[in-house]
Amino acid sequence: MKRTYQPSKLVRKRRHGFRTRSETVGGRRVLANRRSKGRKKLSA
């Protein structure tokens, strides 16, 4: 059986990266929430 998690740095960056998050309203909301929580890492 094939495993569901097949790591790829490029796909990770494209889907969950900072630039991608910044593009959409929802993504910006995610960043804002993580900033207010004081997360060291905002995105992948």
UniProtKB/Swiss-Prot annotation:
Residues 1-44 are annotated as: Disordered. GO terms for cellular component: ribonucleoprotein complex; ribosome. It comes from Gluconobacter oxydans (strain 621H). GO terms for molecular function: structural constituent of ribosome. Belongs to the bacterial ribosomal protein bL34 family. This is Large ribosomal subunit protein bL34. The keyword Ribonucleoprotein applies. Keywords: Ribonucleoprotein, Ribosomal protein.
